[in-house]
């Protein structure tokens, strides 16, 4: 049997490929500059390591559950809360899906023109309409099956992983190899350069860090496949944290060598990764080659992510949905098994968010920043259910068996779960504050604040409405059944 077990280092590499990407480095550097190095170390120690080990215990305890987080919640609390967990997992992907068309446009704009002008010079109306067309096209294609794209997407994901590591190696090595390379950020040898100013503005950026290191629950299928999970799984998670830490710190230092931390480009979040590869390529004598390879792999990866994120979360929510909480019309399938009305609901919600910026976003750079920050507010909401399940598990820990336990002492375990829950919640709430100068554009500031607050509230309220509709539907069906009973004269 041991020959079929995977080792701790394999688990670490699988998880690393799932949770890490170059975008994590670029987005957080764009918000904090070189001081993000310290932030990475803090978030890893205070949040990511306990998060990953909490997931490990939940996976080990409910090793036969196939529903992931919603199954954990159902086993530790109620079916109703399990439905809300499943709904949250699906609905947080709505802003994520709305962002993908713009990312695809930006990537292929760099391939075609060698810069970010294709999208930045478009009007917001044109960007919104083209993005909507791209999304609707892939929404339709998702109903037809995309097996070929899944294979291509997997290859693109691997290529992106390699490019992210290559970027770090080349950037760190550039001063020693390319004689004309000059480090952009001054005083990078001074420790004070890396110390953040812990003010209110700083704490509004924490949600982006949480967003970057989240997603550890994706490793759930591998915990019980690990040899000696009690010893080897935590070892693998510490290796994972080490790899994430090294890539985050060195990646941020590499960004600081290419871009001046005190004078960051306004389009860094949208175009920073492409510009970085372009600059490195020029210094290493390969021109735009590295940038084009990165743009192609990222573009294909974004297409695959768009297609998968339309289909997979929807199936998780509706494939075995409880009729008590999800109305029949939403569970309805075609003869080919397509969740027709589920796709329609996805299309409506995503289309609204794609078109929403027309009411208050002035340019492409602000659109990318707003959508990225909106995702950093909404996406971590699903992590809350992980920590809730862990707290509830430890309340009744005597009733469950687990090969691996994060913390054996019940009270300490509940404190760890509560810490991660509150940290995530506070980060999401603070992340709602817009990341732009109020004085420069008050109307845009208020638009972003309102949309950042209302989007998660509306999405969650919609999920609370469905059980009410389902109950009405069932009462109506029961009433019709009673009316058909024929009583004898």
Swiss-Prot record:
Disruption phenotype: Disruption of the gene leads to strong reduction of aspartate uptake, but only marginally affects glutamate uptake. One of its GO terms (cellular component) is plasma membrane. GO terms for molecular function: transmembrane transporter activity. Gene3D superfamilies: Amino acid/polyamine transporter I. The keyword Transmembrane helix applies. GO terms for biological process: amino acid transport. It is found in: Cell membrane. InterPro entries: AA/rel_permease1 (IPR002293), APC_superfamily (IPR050367). The chain crosses the membrane at residues 6-26, 36-56, 91-111, 122-142, 152-172, 195-215, 238-258, 290-310, 342-362, 373-393, 413-433, 449-469. The keyword ATP-binding does not apply. Keywords: Amino-acid transport, Cell membrane, Membrane, Transmembrane, Transmembrane helix, Transport. It is a multi-pass membrane protein. Involved in aspartate and glutamate uptake. Plays no significant role in the excretion of accumulated glutamate. Belongs to the amino acid-polyamine-organocation (APC) superfamily. Glutamate:GABA antiporter (GGA) (TC 2.A.3.7) family. This is Aspartate/glutamate permease AcaP. It comes from Lactococcus lactis subsp. cremoris (strain MG1363). The gene is acaP.
